[in-house]
């Protein structure tokens, strides 16, 4: 629901996430096994869903862990309440999340076109034209590298952002010629970066 969405946004904001993370939860995603995960209630407030559930079922269940302060989400929930008490409009935060998600969609479109231009996937390996890659904006380079890592390693989650940025910078500054990250082996051969599965 909307409250979960805003909490997810604030958690990722506190971790320094970029567009990918700040776009928060998507209404529909396809998992790596092909299953579609649909979240139809992201625009509904928790309090409204509770009222509907109580009206239909007569009661609702409460998760006691929601009050456990050792969990980050519990503390973020308290922060969200404080923001509301201070006059921050939660609906506008929700609108900002949608705007960021729209930006992510535009970047995804450009990244997909760029990958077709200078990344070749063959025999469980990716070969990236590093000269063309370097001409792209940093955010696009980051997203392309994430996409390659996920495609080759078959992992749902990519490595931490800072590690991917360091990888890109290392190869651009010719500090490294071969390394591993996110279940992949990266090796620079002349103007091309070869990416294979680590294990």
Task: Briefly describe each language-model feature range.
Residues 14, 29-34, 74, 78-79, ...:
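AMP-forming adenylation/ATP pyrophosphatase catalytic core
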């Amino acid at each position: 629901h909307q409250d979960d969405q805003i909490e997810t946004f604030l958690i990722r904001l506190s971790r320094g996430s970029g567009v990918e993370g700040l776009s928060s939860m998507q209404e529909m995603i396809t998992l790596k096994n092909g299953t579609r995960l649909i979240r139809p209630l992201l625009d509904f407030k928790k309090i409204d869903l509770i009222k509907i559930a109580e009206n239909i079922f007569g009661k609702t269940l409460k998760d006691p862990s929601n009050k456990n302060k050792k969990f980050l989400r519990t503390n973020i929930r308290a922060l969200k309440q404080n923001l509301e008490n201070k006059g921050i409009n939660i609906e506008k935060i929700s609108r900002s999340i949608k705007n960021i998600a729209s930006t992510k969609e535009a970047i995804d479109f450009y990244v997909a076109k760029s990958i077709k231009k200078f990344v070749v996937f063959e025999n469980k390996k990716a070969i990236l034209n590093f000269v063309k890659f370097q001409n792209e904006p940093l955010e696009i380079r980051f997203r392309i590298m994430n996409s390659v890592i996920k495609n080759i390693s078959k992992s749902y989650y990519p490595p931490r952002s800072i590690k991917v940025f360091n990888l890109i910078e290392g190869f651009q500054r010719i500090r490294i010629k071969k390394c591993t990250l996110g279940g992949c082996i990266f090796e620079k051969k002349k103007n091309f970066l070869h990416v294979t599965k680590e294990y």
